[in-house]
């Protein structure tokens, strides 16, 4: 008799041309992820081959009960690391039945920015460092921390190994491999300064694909922590006191920045970002004021400053970029719970399209 595990891992490829497509979308809070699956004829190689779908928006905080239908538009596809085979994960955005983007659809505006000829010509690259915290289920307390107590002070945990310093590595490595399998351009992982906190990096990714890849990487991480009985937190300051917060540092460059003379373009872009500091901060994640205090490798939320190799700055420029006179810079302001569509689109808009008026 087949076990549950046998059935979960059942390979359908030799008995049907149908596949399972898991449609994923961002829920009403702007940070929660929802998904549901449907059967389609495979193989699917492009999202345009997939049908639109709908869901009950009144149950996700995205539509009233008397007119609850929200339409899913498939936008990007990835291999499904859970069902494997030809099965796929589908990143969608959300519209009214009349074809208007709903308020929580932040992808639509970002796609408009990235499709602008001036932005497309600059081929914007993003590398996003997604920090997160693993929590003990039912306790809302970091993994590896004594119940009701605290571990030793920060210092031994960053990029560390050992049962007393690294907590949750099996989840981290499972996520790393699952993202590679899915086709996400995940570029690395590391343990963070606060115990129980980790980071993965996605990129370089071009334009709108950076947001798609971060959202699907988050979805995969949610599924893996679900399987492990661990809770994923993207709170930018999960523990009060002398503990690091969690951010989503966003590395960015344009074609002009990557070419000879690019350092001057970088400085001009940073100057523009400084002039729109308040607008960016307002869009860079909920609760970020608890993280951006001027301590724990952050700049104060009300102050904009940049520097070379300065992790206490709003914008950090690397030593190699300064030396070579071209390259990229890092926006250190985004919180771990930021919407990558908002952040990437806003950076491109400010640095390329905005004329500074």
Curated annotation (Swiss-Prot):
Catalytic activities: L-glutamate + NH4(+) + ATP = L-glutamine + ADP + phosphate + H(+)
Tissue: Found mainly in the cortical tissues of seedling roots, stem and seedling shoot.
Any single biological process term in GO: glutamine biosynthetic process
GO molecular function: ATP binding; glutamine synthetase activity
Subunit structure: Homooctamer.
Compartment(s) where it occurs, according to its Swiss-Prot or TrEMBL record: Cytoplasm
Function of the molecule: Plays a role in the flow of nitrogen into nitrogenous organic compounds.
Name of protein: Glutamine synthetase root isozyme 5
EC number: 6.3.1.2
Keywords: ATP-binding, Cytoplasm, Ligase, Nucleotide-binding
Segments forming domain GS beta-grasp: 19-99
Membership in a protein family: Belongs to the glutamine synthetase family.
Main localization category: cytoplasm
Residue ranges of domain GS catalytic in the record: 106-357
InterPro entries: Gln_synt_N, Gln_synt_N_sf, Gln_synth/guanido_kin_cat_dom, Gln_synth_cat_dom, Gln_synth_gly_rich_site, Gln_synth_N_conserv_site, Glutamine_Synthetase
Entry GO terms, CC: cytoplasm
